[in-house]
Amino acid sequence: MTGDEALIDLEAVTRVYATGEVEVRALDGVSLRIASGEFVAVMGPSGSGKSTLMNILGCLDRPTGGRYMLAGREVSRLRKGELADVRSRTLGFVFQNFNLLPRTSALENVELPLMYQGVRARERHTRASEALDRVGLAPRSGHHPNQLSGGQQQRVAIARALVTRPRVILADEPTGNLDSRTSLEVMALFQELGGQGITIILVTHEPEVAQFASRVVVVKDGRVRSDERRAPRIVDLDALGAPGNDAAPAGGPS
């Protein structure tokens, strides 16, 4: 990979936390380069530094030392307001617990990031509708989270991440609350998005999930211990059926 190909470029990144007189090196000289369209799984035991790494990649935290280049821009020394702008325009986030507003429809949940950007109502509606269609949930755009299954809620969360047209999606244990079939549907969607040029960075502790990525980075004691590219397992969509067909919760609309 050449420098021109690297969408993400970490060089000797450290993150040190001070607790009284004790210093904890959560990251210790991490160097990592990721290209557009790569699907990367980040693995490691509890306390390994993988969450700190994701926070820095997501511009939620700044490194103590080293350099972080994102889309050709050095973001490691940006101020909080500048980091927030990078997050809203370049990055999308997907979380284990979905983080949907319970009294708000799927469409309105997806519109939220655009509201923060000041996008006008008509364009918000159009882009949110397109994002829901992209994840196979256009027919359920008016449903509230409690009327959706776990898999459907996670697809709403992915649509919300996509609506700002990010170059990178950061997913933190996105299948942790899903059954095995629904987890496969989410992995299929991530593989599809990677094929469209969106970079996917996925934190997981499950090897069964990591096998769908084309690259697996293992972090331990704040360092990258291994970085392996391999042929990913491809989800058989025909065997799963069309997206959006998982059942709604009991009592919810079908």
Please place each PLM-identified region on the residue numbering:
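Conserved beta-strand-loop-alpha-helix hinge in the C-terminal portion
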Residues: 223-250
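ABC family nucleotide-binding domain
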Residues: 5-224
